[in-house]
């Protein structure tokens, strides 16, 4: 039996960022191995991806995954999603990768008699939604959340059976592993060998709570103890210019703060390996795949309190959590992190692809075996 899945996503193949990578990992896990259950040998997932961003042309996609060209217009996107579902009917599952598209996903699931799976990541789902989105969330047959915090925040306002809300965290790829950074790469970045603090993430004006500015304010005190320390920021976005201006206002030159811009995926392992501490004391991270990538490379990590990064940091097993609004605590945490050395990457083994794939396939099997939720408005 083929399980046909229409996936409505913001981005997937051909797009950067943690959510795009999550979608890729999830879909590949669902199509590359048998599902669980007594009839597993008879089942095969086939996924039709409809993205709003990200062009997969020229990318060799895994077998049983097809991705359509990106469509940003809301109306046109809805028409394309309906056409894809109609053309490939019967459809068994409508997967929704963002609450923004939940009403459309719910409508398609009702029309085609399919099960409806909603994936949630972070702040997009932490607060109550307006009437239509709320109804679409509450009608999901299955909701998966990347962290315990996201699950708890969602259940705090949505009328959902807790048994229908499962935690399915990010996974980390095998390319992220301990090693020695290429000397040529370090030379290319102009790093002379002093301690390196590293943050990796999109610099978006809608995501200003990743902790860059609190770190800026304590860099002079840190450099008093570690004179050659450099804070390296990898990532690009519409907030980069403001952050660069803020660093200049504080008198932090290139010798102290280095903005790298976008870093290709293939360079990330070397970037993590040359750093001494990964720092992203965020207040609104849904999970944070970058924490896992850093820890997988042996790098100790520093996250914020109260958000989903706690799951990645595993209650201090691979680092620590700190309040970014407390400069003294932040300073002490970074000092401790720099003095404590590297971590054992075995601590994040549960987040490797084999375990993630088993849980993902089990979740899909449970969804297919569970009765459909009532589709009444």
Tell me the role of every PLM-derived stretch.
Residues 96-102:
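Short His-centered aromatic/hydrophobic patch
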Residues 241-263:
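Nucleotide-activated donor-binding/catalytic signature segment of Leloir-type glycosyltransferases, i.e.
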Residues 300-303:
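Short hydrophobic beta-strand element within catalytic cores of glycosyltransferases
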Residues 283:
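Aromatic "clamp/platform" in nucleotide-sugar-dependent glycosyltransferases that forms part
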Residues 8, 191-210, 216-219:
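Conserved donor-binding/catalytic core segment of Leloir-type glycosyltransferases
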Residues 315-316, 320-327, 335-341:
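Conserved acidic donor-binding segment of nucleotide-sugar-dependent glycosyltransferases
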Residues 339-375:
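A charged, aromatic-enriched C-terminal amphipathic alpha-helix characteristic of glycosyltransferases
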Residues 137, 262-263, 270-275:
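Short alpha-helical donor nucleotide-sugar binding micro-motif in glycosyltransferases
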């Amino acid at each position: 039996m083929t399980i046909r899945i229409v996936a409505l996503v913001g981005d997937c193949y051909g797009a950067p960022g943690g959510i795009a990578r999550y979608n890729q990992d999830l879909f590949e896990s669902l199509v590359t191995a048998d599902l669980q259950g007594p009839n597993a040998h008879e089942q095969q997932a086939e996924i039709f991806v409809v993205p709003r961003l990200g062009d997969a042309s020229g990318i060799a996609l895994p077998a049983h995954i097809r991705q359509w060209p990106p469509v940003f217009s809301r109306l046109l996107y809805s028409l394309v999603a309906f056409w894809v579902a109609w053309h490939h009917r019967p459809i068994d599952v409508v997967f929704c990768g963002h609450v923004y598209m939940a009403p459309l996903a719910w409508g398609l699931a009702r029309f085609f008699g399919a099960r409806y799976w909603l994936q949630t990541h972070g702040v997009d789902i932490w607060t109550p939604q307006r009437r239509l989105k709320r109804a679409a969330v509450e009608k999901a047959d299955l909701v998966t959340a990347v962290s315990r915090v996201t699950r708890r925040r969602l259940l705090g306002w949505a009328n959902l059976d807790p048994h229908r809300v499962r935690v399915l965290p990010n996974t980390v790829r095998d390319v992220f592993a301990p090693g020695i950074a290429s000397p040529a790469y370090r030379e290319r970045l102009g790093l002379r060998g002093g301690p390196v603090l590293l943050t990796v993430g999109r610099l978006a004006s809608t995501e200003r709570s990743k902790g860059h500015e609190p770190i800026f304010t304590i860099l002079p005190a840190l450099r008093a103890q570690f004179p050659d320390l450099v804070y390296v920021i990898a990532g690009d976005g519409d907030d980069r210019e403001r952050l660069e201006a803020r660093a200049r206002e504080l008198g932090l030159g290139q010798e102290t703060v280095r903005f790298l811009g976008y870093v290709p995926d293939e360079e990330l392992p070397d970037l993590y390996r040359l750093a001494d501490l990964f720092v992203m004391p965020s207040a609104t991270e849904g999970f944070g795949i970058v924490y896992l990538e850093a820890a997988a490379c042996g790098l100790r990590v520093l996250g914020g309190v109260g958000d989903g990064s706690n799951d990645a940091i595993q209650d201090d097993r691979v680092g620590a959590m700190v309040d970014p609004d407390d400069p003294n605590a932040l300073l002490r945490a970074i000092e401790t992190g720099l003095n404590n050395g590297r971590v054992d990457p075995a601590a994040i083994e549960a987040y490797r692809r084999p375990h993630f794939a088993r849980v993902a396939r089990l979740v899909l099997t449970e969804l297919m075996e569970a009765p459909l939720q009532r589709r009444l408005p």
